[in-house]
A protein has these predicted regions:
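Thiamine diphosphate
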Residues: 1-164, 168-177, 182
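Gly/Ser-rich, acidic/histidine-flanked active-site/gating loops
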Residues: 185
Length: 185
């Protein structure tokens, strides 16, 4: 099995570098979300909001209103728990084309309970107009930007980071399922 180191870093840069309407939004987790290289090479397309997730959601909603497509980067738990009201009012209800890249989904984080996004799917699925996508391997991480950007409305992506195994040959496609194995029951 092939292991791919930081697949999102290259995939996001390749996807966003020539699209002026796509902006990279960061919650002060550039390296942890694998966007530090993009920040360094495309500073005119990079906005650091600091550890101000509530402001980041409202600001990104405004960017969406102005015709931009913000790709918001943070740990999953920080994209919905604290900024919930702003996420609902500025992004979900008005159906802004914001792409929320939530890294360290579930209990994959070494940061303890404050960093665990254990209810993110249930919270995000209850929001109007919100689509939730899940990455399962390096191929899906590499194709998540295109998949998310194909949706007319807000998208929350559960992101893998670091060294990620490659399990699938074909990219993630919205609305298509994968058969992992055939059963007989």
């Amino acid at each position: 099995m092939e292991i791919v180191n930081k697949p999102y870093s290259k995939a996001f840069e390749d996807f966003a570098k020539d699209k002026e309407e796509i902006l990279c939004i960061s919650a002060d987790l550039d390296s942890s979300c694998e966007i530090d290289g993009f920040r360094d090479r495309y500073p005119h397309k990079f906005i650091s909001m600091g550890m101000a997730e509530q402001n980041m959601m409202s600001f990104s909603g405004g960017l969406g209103l102005a015709g931009f497509r913000p790709f918001i980067h943070s740990f999953g738990v920080f994209t919905y728990r604290r900024p919930y009201d702003q996420l609902v009012a500025s992004i979900a209800y008005p159906r802004r084309k914001a792409r929320i890249m939530g890294f360290l989904p579930g209990i994959t984080t070494p940061g303890g309970m404050t960093h665990q996004a254990i209810e993110d799917i249930s919270v995000m699925r209850t929001l109007p107009n919100m689509t939730v996508l899940e990455t399962g391997d390096a191929t899906e991480v590499e194709s998540i930007c295109e998949a998310a950007d194909s949706i007319d409305g807000p998208v929350y992506c559960r992101m893998l980071r670091g060294s990620v195994p490659r399990l699938f040959e074909s990219p993630l496609k919205v609305g298509e399922l994968r058969t992992l194995s055939e059963g007989e029951d």
